From Swiss-Prot:
Name of this chain's protein: Branchpoint-bridging protein
Region spans: Disordered: 1-47, 94-124, 202-241, 295-314, 337-518
Organism the protein comes from: Debaryomyces hansenii (strain ATCC 36239 / CBS 767 / BCRC 21394 / JCM 1990 / NBRC 0083 / IGC 2968)
Biased composition, class Pro residues, residue ranges: 408-518
Span of domain KH: 167-233
Chain intervals with Polar residues compositional bias: 340-361
Gene: BBP
Family membership: Belongs to the BBP/SF1 family.
Length: 518
């Protein structure tokens, strides 16, 4: 007999009495249930005896720990005996002995399910064994967290995954989109629930798949195999079942947390009025961010709007371009800059300057640029391909060849006097000027005239001219040129002679004729 055993005993009954006008009704004194059996003070499980009545003073935590340990050992003993004797689990339970308990009322069986081989998979034996195993998994996990140094039974194997189902009340609230709230934008809400709880969540059942899409069913995956039941999302039982959430995890604590978070989403969807669901509002905002259609709207602030209106703005009508003279843009933005319609037109430039002097200027940045002394004299900035090339001298091989000088004189132009001939004698001096005195007589012949090919060196002011050779008279001065004035002993130059009105006689390129002999 288990620690949870109950027994309905005969006792004083009031069924034969008339209570508040009710008619007399006779029922049986006792009712047989699946927990019926012979009461006992001790329960022998394996080699140990467990007390069925707690007589000591225990706290609530200690009583819970004892019940968990007792129930784990009892379930393990039943499964162990059924495995050793190759018998059914129902034969070891009071509910399985229908012959000994003719008044026992069993629960109705669910609709049958069949596997790929055509065998029924949800028999009473399979469902009872699965229920005992799930109960033991849960109790072992709870006992491991509450009992210090707890050791699970020897034949116990922890399942790879356990699962739970949460049915969604779609029939009660058909207007609420529970699937959309649980999934969220692109599955982010369901993914967040999985990260917070540590369990795996999946929406299954009718309505979990869009219309027009079919899911392949696999009859091998059913509720009887706990370790493989929900590894494949396409379950035969989930397709015909109502809409529900399947929570799969390796621990019951994670499953419990996932159940709590899922119920919060469902309750918020039911209790929130239309348009006031914060979860749905956040999902719509997140979806707009993902799609790139979010438009941020700021609340109206009167102070901010007033300060924005009072702020002085830029009057475009007062901007005058210095390049084209038009209104509404700066010179740096002018399209006609550097063209004939711009700086090269003095009339337009004068109009722009006159308008600029009369119109106030409100662009502070433009004023700072004009007042900056570094900008004075700065040329207009042009791209390199528009700048003029500097005057660089050409290399010798690119210079044009000049024609050689010709010995033949060109013919004189018509209407002009011919130039003086180099072979003709010089004209006589005018009568106003006296001829120079003849040189003094000398016995020596005059020196030969200097050659016209070699020019004498220019006189130097630093060095005195060399003295003439002895015995040779100095050459006479050229005709038509007055001798230099003598120097005064005081070192002061005499006043210049009066200017002559007559022009000097042209000099010939040939040597002058020698003077007549004395």
């Amino acid at each position: 007999m288990s620690a949870y055993s109950r027994r309905y005993t005969d006792g004083p009954s009031n069924y034969g009495q008339d209570v508040r006008g009710r008619s007399e009704k006779k029922v049986e004194a006792s009712h047989t249930t699946k927990w019926s059996g012979t009461p006992s003070r001790h329960k022998k499980i394996g080699k140990e005896d467990f007390d069925t009545i707690v007589t000591g003073h225990l706290t609530q935590e200690q009583m819970d720990a004892y019940q968990q340990y007792f129930r784990i050992e009892e379930i393990s003993d039943i499964l162990r005996m059924a495995s050793e004797s190759q018998s059914e689990v129902l034969s070891l339970l009071p509910s399985g002995n229908i012959a000994n308990n003719p008044n026992y009322e069993r629960e109705p069986s669910p609709p049958p399910k069949y596997d790929a081989a055509g065998n029924r998979s949800n028999t009473r034996e399979a469902r009872t064994k699965l229920a005992l195993e799930k109960e033991r998994h849960y109790l072992v996990e709870v006992a491991a967290g509450s009992i210090k140094n707890y050791m699970s039974p020897i034949d116990y194997r922890k399942p790879v995954k356990t699962y739970e189902k949460i049915y969604i009340p779609v029939k009660d609230y058909p207007d609420i989109n529970f699937v959309g709230l649980l999934l969220g934008p692109r599955g982010n809400t369901l993914r967040q629930l999985q990260e917070d709880s540590g369990a795996r969540l999946a929406i299954r059942g009718k309505g979990s798949v869009k219309d027009g899409k079919s899911t392949s069913s696999n009859n091998d995956d059913d509720d009887s195999n706990s370790s493989l039941s929900f590894s494949n999302p396409n379950l035969n039982s989930s397709g015909n079942d109502d809409l529900h959430v399947v929570i799969t995890s390796d621990s019951q604590s994670k499953i419990a947390k996932a159940i709590k978070l899922t119920n919060q989403v469902i309750e918020k969807a039911i209790s929130s009025p239309v348009g006031q669901n914060d979860l749905k509002r956040g999902q719509l905002r997140e979806l707009a961010i993902l799609n790139g259609t979010l438009r941020e709207t700021k609340p109206y602030n009167p102070e901010t709007q007033q300060s924005r209106r009072s702020r002085p703005g830029l009057d475009v009508s007062q901007l005058v371009c210095k390049s084209c003279g038009k209104v509404g843009h700066f010179a740096r933005d002018c399209k006609f800059r550097g063209t004939s319609d711009g700086n090269n037109n003095p009339i337009v430039q004068d109009q722009a300057d006159s308008y600029q002097q009369t119109a106030p200027y409100s662009d502070s940045r433009r004023q700072r640029e004009e007042e900056d002394p570094r900008n004075n004299g700065r040329e207009e900035i042009l791209p390199p391909w528009k700048k003029k090339k500097p005057n660089v001298p050409l290399p010798p091989w690119q210079k044009p060849q000049q024609p050689l000088p010709s010995t033949d004189a060109p013919p004189p132009p018509v209407g002009l006097a011919p130039p003086p001939s180099s072979l003709a004698p010089p004209p006589p001096p005018p009568s106003s000027l006296a001829p120079p005195p003849p040189p003094p007589p000398s016995s020596l012949a005059p020196p030969p005239p200097p050659s016209s090919d070699i020019a004498p060196p220019p006189p130097s002011s630093d060095r005195a001219p060399p003295p003439p050779p002895s015995g040779i008279a100095p050459p006479p001065p050229p005709s038509g040129i007055a001798p230099p004035p003598p120097k005064s002993p005081n070192g002061v130059a005499p006043p210049p002679p009066p200017a002559n009105d007559a022009p000097p006689a042209p000099s010939s390129t040939k040597n002058p004729p020698p003077p007549p002999p004395a």
